[in-house]
Amino acid sequence: NSDSWNCLSEVEGQELMAQLFVDVIIKNTNSTGKGDHFWDSAEMNLLKALVLFVERSYPPERRNIGEAYQLLVSCSEKELNELFDALPLGHPARAPYSIFRQSSESVRGGVIIGLGSRLQVFQNADIRAITSHDEIDLELPGKQPCAYYCITSDQDSTFDFLSSLFLSFIFIKLVRYADQNCPGG
């Protein structure tokens, strides 16, 4: 059991936040602990494109990481190309998708498989449900005393990237809240 937290909602339509979001996921889903820069970068571009596409194009109730995963696994490469080609030229998802698209066919296939493997926890309906909407206010600790408990397994690292996302974004949100609302920041 867990309160729900839509990690994708923290992107708030900002490209820089999308980059941070993607970076945390890629760095915390390497099975060996040390990734290959080429593949990591390619997967980052594809994930950033999917995140920005969902964040900017979907209705609010469908803006979540599970929807980005569904795009990855349910659309063919041709269908993805059509989706991204239909975006306005200035759409922030176009540039990272364009970088992904410039690679060879075999590389693109490897990137899709690699990213799908990293995000395979979203095959689980419970994980999709927990990350589909917000019940947690990351700014609340700045407004009133409260505690959040983030329990992770000491034997299985499968879900560690979600706790890494949570901690990264809670620090960002609290610092921004303090800068805007507290005397002296």
What role is predicted for each listed range?
Residues 1-185:
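P-loop NTPase motor domains
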